[in-house]
Amino acid sequence: MNKNVVIKSLAALTILTSVTGIGITLVEEVQQTAKAENNVTKVKDTNIFPYTGVVAFKSATGFVVGKNTILTNKHVSKNYKVGDRITAHPNSDKGNGGIYSIKKIINYPGKEDVSVIQVEERAIERGPKGFNFNDNVTPFKYAAGAKAGERIKVIGYPHPYKNKYVLYESTGPVMSVEGSSIVYSAHTESGNSGSPVLNSNNELVGIHFASDVKNDDNRNAYGVYFTPEIKKFIAENIDK
């Protein structure tokens, strides 16, 4: 995809956080969009990997990248401050991996929509494996790369409050990878911002941040592709 196409595509999309209220409610189990091959599945058990790597904000999603450290979008973290709370892999009213306080927020200095958030190690509300954040979550590892045609999955909390913090997994093909941009055909909604974009081995290729406004067979979703520079920034800001 050339830069002009990327710019035009980005101009036509909207950032989907639950603050906007844009989007439609997910079906209970599986939804398919014929040509785009978009599949959305409700996650039944969030206490197994890769779901133990995902966390919920009040209005969006994040995921674990290291000790006491999660990743989300800048447009998500700007609505939070030190002392606010995140919940590790909640599963509606069936429990979660604990509730934790934010202790530090570090935004990526470039244009990419990436923000590192460090949390207090000890839970405000314990998870199934005690009060330690790192005992209740599983950090993701990076993929070697990604290319057009490969299948990816986006795991997150669309309309988290409306859907009672039920986790959903959406799959589809990669359309293009260029620089720090990855475009894919996977159904995402308000609240999916900050979701991990994973390959078939559940390895990180990027972070979701937006989707086209249109809701048809040609609707694409957009993520930040993890370049060496972005990986370096994340590594330097993992809690010690």
Swiss-Prot record:
Serine protease that cleaves specifically after the sequence Trp-Glu-Leu-Gln. The keyword Membrane does not apply. Keywords: Hydrolase, Protease, Secreted, Serine protease, Signal. Its EC number is 3.4.21.-. Residues 1-36 form the signal peptide. It comes from the Bacteria. GO terms for molecular function: serine-type endopeptidase activity. The keyword Manganese does not apply. The active site is at 75 (charge relay system), 113 (charge relay system), 193 (charge relay system). One of its GO terms (cellular component) is extracellular region. One of its GO terms (biological process) is proteolysis. The gene is splB. It is found in: Secreted. InterPro entries: Peptidase_S1_PA, Peptidase_S1_PA_chymotrypsin, Peptidase_S1B, Peptidase_S1B_tx, Trypsin_dom, V8_his_AS. Belongs to the peptidase S1B family. This is Serine protease SplB.
